[in-house]
UniProtKB/Swiss-Prot annotation:
Residues 441-476, 514-534, 904-943 are annotated as: Disordered. Glycans are attached at residues 41, 165, 170, 223, 231, 286, 365, 451. This is Receptor-like kinase TMK3. The gene is TMK3. PANTHER family: OSJNBA0070M12.3 PROTEIN, RECEPTOR-LIKE KINASE TMK3. Involved in auxin signal transduction and cell expansion and proliferation regulation. Disruption phenotype: No visible phenotype. Tmk1 and tmk3 double mutants, tmk2 and tmk3 double mutants, tmk3 and tmk4 double mutants, tmk1, tmk2 and tmk3 triple mutants and tmk2, tmk3 and tmk4 triple mutants have no visible phenotypes. Tmk1, tmk3 and tmk4 triple mutants have a severe reduction in organ size, a substantial delay in growth and development, and a decrease in fertility. Tmk1, tmk2, tmk3 and tmk4 quadruple mutants are embryo lethal. It is found in: Membrane. Disulfide bonds join 54-61, 315-323, 353-361. It catalyses: L-seryl-[protein] + ATP = O-phospho-L-seryl-[protein] + ADP + H(+); L-threonyl-[protein] + ATP = O-phospho-L-threonyl-[protein] + ADP + H(+). Residues 585-866 form the Protein kinase domain. It is an enzyme of class 2 (transferase). GO terms for molecular function: ATP binding; protein serine kinase activity; protein serine/threonine kinase activity.
Length: 943
């Protein structure tokens, strides 16, 4: 045979082979599609008469005649689905919703290209156990409103790693919400709607740190705390109506995009946190039918509010009206017990002397608090000492723990304190001889502490109810850490081995949700997915916990490890990664120097900028290492929009490094004192006032709204950082000391900056929260005058700003007052009136005696009354309901109901840098600390 004939024969054989392959592929889908056609009772308006399924109505195929889309929606179709649908291996979209199809949903496992499965509003009776198996491309699944037999969400959901929207409302689901909805298993999940099922148990802590924007869990048997919501910073709408959730509403200040908050018909207790009330994004809130306490919250005019009178335990029905001081005190007492429902049910109204369980009064004064055998847990609140007429306190036969507060010894009329048969520990305080103290039945009384891992489930006694609570769960975690850490220290050798094992395991474990860096063994890890200015931190691939993370600490000394461990949800980053991003800590990258190290600018391979604070062996003494660990401990507990957030850290041999977000607008000091040199514009009064309020809110959280009281001790303009939006954030917590439980002062070495130091602190070294008030007063003076706290360029009698300010104020000379105002501030009548109020406030803050200074809450109230609050002016075009929330609430509800087909509330179908100050060495700061950070993630804000 000639070569030409042979070539022709080969060509013909190839064509026949290709034709046979094409026919076999088409035949595969054709058989399945014919089975589908036979199983369904198609209506007359559906034309599936053509022999080629690719030409059927609502069916699409690819270039190889493989079926990719079947979209038969709202056609009134009856029948069942065939069992061989899974052979449509190229299927991308299957939509059969709003029909009358019945029978079981067939096995669809292995459909690796399927992106959308929409079968809602049919008559399906069961779900295959391996429904999600092999569906690695699945992005959307809607099965709501089907009469399924009871079923449990299968573990195979974890295989749908691309899942974004999952709607399974009214689907007969039972059991608990699984943990795998966390960001590690389903990193792209943004909408989770599981309402009207039979779910029970608590919200999984794995929700923390997820990208979930819409969470609907209405009408079930769910219970426990909702504290995890405070760490779901991407939330836009959350609806938990009609469950059995209890405890307080957590701090929600980190949920900057939250629009809809519906917790109607639960058993929530405690004070509505100011962080919810002040959310500028909020449009709809529903709190009716709970046991919420304290004052009725006053939301902005743009917020649609559903708070039916007498359907909670508020002290009055008038929004914004303050409670009787006795009520505030007792609510604070209830907070330390974890806000038990039994107290919230009884403690209603604004007069605790009328039918409040356990409360007895005489002449309007509370004389007896009797909580015997009330099944209380938690601790004794020091706030009890505010009830100065108390004669009897009976807390016997409960499950209380902790110490007996020293403050109770100040009760001059107290005759009996009975804490028998609880779990108190420590040495009881010394009461007067006239007081009978009954402590029997407390096995650990007189000892350092109980042999337990938890102190109290309730909020710590040092916190106050006015700013809201983060719930009992968070306090329990905090307590656990205090006990666990010493244990970890005792077995450090074993933990080193475990840490090494974790590192090796982390290197082997694959994370399909991570995006591999092309340049190194790194991944891009989103720090705050709900933020407009996402900060991405490049770290080595690892097995990171979502949200809560591990609270224990271990460290591998291996230089080869890229990441050591996760502590309290923060990233432990290798020294090599930090060397790479800072150009090996080059001089060109230095942003500033401080007493304990140098701060470098770093840039990740994707362009993200960070600030790295490095303390080398030459400057890290034992004391410095203690400072470093203290700084980590404090920073990891700070969650507030106006406080710094720690991104990560590194411990490697003698290296100690902290990683902060980069703040493009630098420090307040730069804008206030060096704006000309840096080519900036001077701050106008409105901006200065907003910055002052931001700082006050951040420090207020430190003082009274955190689980324990913190004192900053070195407030100054170089420790106040500004973001691109010019919102302020307080930095430099290296000098913070944790105040003792229930107290607000400590005695320690003087650490701060001259000019900002309160006189009693500078002289005696005794520090209280009032030293921060003094420092803030100095900052207010600087904002008004544009002068530094200490200015050597001024005449000798005017070098010290506070002294000069007092002299001007005492003169009561109107011209002297106006001449003292920064000439760069444009003045009109309103501005002058505003400055006068801040001038007066600054003077009170810098009073010589600490007791004459206001607390930070008062400062916030004064400043907030002078600040124009932002109001929403545009409707989000991407609103999931397509509803204009600027319409009147009745119209919104009507449109919402029409969309949902429900008669109730909506358901669910269908700076220069962080961590650095001046480049100059600042000897007056003892020591200088970082001064730049960006927006914090999962805040625990009270304001």
């Amino acid at each position: 045979m000639s070569n030409s004939h042979l070539g022709t024969l080969c060509f013909i054989i190839s064509l026949l082979g290709l034709a046979n392959f094409s026919l076999s592929q088409t035949g595969l889908d054709d058989s399945t599609m014919q089975s589908l056609k036979s199983s369904l009772n198609l209506t007359s308006d559906v034309d599936w008469s053509n022999p080629n399924p690719c030409k059927w109505q609502s069916v699409q195929c690819d270039g190889s005649n493989r079926v990719t889309k079947i979209q038969l929606k709202q056609k009134g179709i009856r029948g069942t689905l065939p069992t061989n649908l899974q052979s449509l291996s190229e299927l991308v979209i299957l939509e059969l919703f709003l029909n009358r199809i019945s029978g079981p949903i067939p096995d669809l496992s292995g459909l690796s290209r399927l992106q959308t499965l929409n079968l809602h509003d049919n008559l399906f009776t069961s779900v295959p156990k391996n429904l999600f198996s092999g569906m690695s491309s699945l992005q959307e699944m809607y099965l709501e409103n089907n009469p399924f037999d009871p079923w449990v969400i299968p573990d195979t959901v974890k295989e749908a790693t691309s899942l974004q929207n999952l709607t399974l409302s009214n689907c007969s689901i039972i059991g608990k919400i699984p943990d795998f909805f966390g960001s590690q298993s389903l990193p792209s999940l943004t909408n989770l709607k599981l309402s009207q099922n039979g779910l029970e148990g608590e919200l999984p802590m794995s929700f923390a740190g997820t990208s979930i924007q819409s969470l609907f869990l209405n009408g079930q048997k769910l219970n426990g705390s909702i504290s995890v919501l405070g760490n779901m910073t991407s939330l836009v709408e959350v609806s938990l109506q009609g469950n059995q959730f209890s405890g307080p509403i957590p701090d929600l200040s980190g949920l900057v995009s939250l629009r809809v908050f519906n917790v109607r018909e639960n058993q929530l207790t405690g004070v509505v946190p100011q962080s919810l009330v002040s959310l500028s994004s909020l449009t709809t809130v529903n709190l009716t039918n709970n046991y919420l306490q304290g004052p009725t919250p006053l939301f902005g005019k743009s917020v649609g509010v559903d708070i039916v009178n007498n359907m909670n335990s508020f002290c009055t029905n008038v929004a914004g009206e303050a409670c009787d001081p006795r009520v505030d005190t007792l609510v604070s007492v209830a907070e330390s017990f974890g806000y038990p429902v039994k107290l919230a049910e009884s403690w209603k109204g604004n007069n605790p002397c009328v039918n409040w369980v356990g409360i007895t009064c005489s002449g309007g004064n509370i004389t007896v608090v009797n909580m015997r055998k009330q099944d209380l847990s938690g601790t004794i609140s020091p706030s009890l000492a505010k009830l100065t007429s108390l004669e009897t306190i009976n807390l016997a036969d409960n499950k209380l723990s902790g110490h007996i507060p020293d403050e109770l010894t100040t009760l001059s009329k107290l005759r009996l304190l009975d804490v028998s048969n609880n779990d108190f520990y420590g040495i009881p305080p010394k009461f007067r001889d006239t007081v009978t103290l009954v402590t029997e039945g407390n096995a650990n009384m007189g000892k350092n502490g109980p042999n337990k891992t938890s102190d109290a489930p309730g909020a710590s006694p040092g916190s106050k109810p006015s700013g809201g609570s983060d719930g009992s769960e968070t306090s329990k975690k905090s307590s656990n850490v205090k006990i666990i850490v010493p244990v970890v220290g005792g077995v450090v050798g074993a933990l080193c081995l475990v840490g090494l094992g974790v590192c090796l395991y982390a290197k082997k474990r694959k994370r399909p949700a991570r995006v591999q860096s092309p340049s190194s063994n790194m991944v891009i890890h989103p720090h705050h997915s709900g933020d407009n200015d996402d900060i991405k931190l490049t770290v080595a691939a690892s097995s990171l916990n979502s949200g809560g993370g591990s609270d224990s600490y271990s460290h591998s000394g291996s230089a080869a490890s890229d990441i050591h461990v996760v502590e309290a949800g923060n990233l432990v980053i290798s020294i090599q990664v930090l060397r790479n991003v800072t150009n090996n800590f080059s001089e060109e990258n230095i942003l500033g120097r401080g007493g304990f190290g140098t701060v470098y600018k770093g840039e990740l391979h994707d362009g993200t900028k960070i600030a790295v604070k490095r303390m080398e062996s030459s400057v890290v003494s034992d004391k410095g290492l203690t400072e470093f660990k203290s700084e980590i401990t404090v920073l990891t507990k700070m969650r507030h929009r106006h406080l710094v957030a720690l991104l990560g850290y590194c411990l490697d041999g003698n290296e100690r490094l902290l990683v902060y977000e980069y703040m493009p607008q630098g420090t307040l000091s730069q804008h206030l004192f060096h704006w000309k040199e840096e080519g900036r514009k001077p701050l106008d009064w409105t901006r200065r006032l907003a910055i002052a309020l931001d700082v006050a809110r951040g420090v207020e959280y430190l003082h009274t709204l955190a689980h324990q009281s913190f004192i900053h001790r070195d407030l100054k303009p170089s420790n106040i950082l500004l973001g691109d939006d010019m919102r302020a954030k307080v930095s430099d917590f290296g000098l913070v000391r944790l105040a003792p439980d229930g107290k607000y002062s400590i005695e320690t070495r003087v650490a701060g900056t001259f000019g900002y130091l309160a006189p009693e602190y500078a002289v005696t070294g005794r520090v209280t929260t009032k030293v921060d008030i003094f420092s803030l007063g100095v900052i207010l003076m600087e904002l008004i005058t544009g002068r530094k706290a200490l200015d050597e360029t001024q005449p000798e009698d005017s070098v010290h700003l506070v002294t000069w300010f007092r002299r001007v104020a005492a003169s009561k000379d109107e011209n002297a007052f106006k001449n003292a105002i920064d000439p760069n501030i444009s003045l009109d009548d309103d501005t002058v009136a505003s400055i006068e109020k801040v001038w007066e406030l600054a003077g009170h803050c810098c009073a010589r005696e600490p007791y004459q200074r206001p607390d930070m809450a008062h400062i916030v109230n004064v400043l907030s009354s002078l600040t124009v609050q932002w109001k929403p002016t545009e409707t989000d075009p991407d609103d999931v309901y397509g509803i204009d929330y600027d319409m009147p609430l009745p119209q919104v509800l009507k449109k919402w109901q029409a969309f949902e087909g429900l008669s109730q509330t909506a358901d669910d179908s269908g700076s220069s840098s962080s961590a650095y100050g001046s480049k100059d060495n600042t000897q007056t700061s003892i020591p200088t600390r970082p001064s730049g950070f960006a927006d914090s993630f999962t805040s625990v804000d009270g304001r």
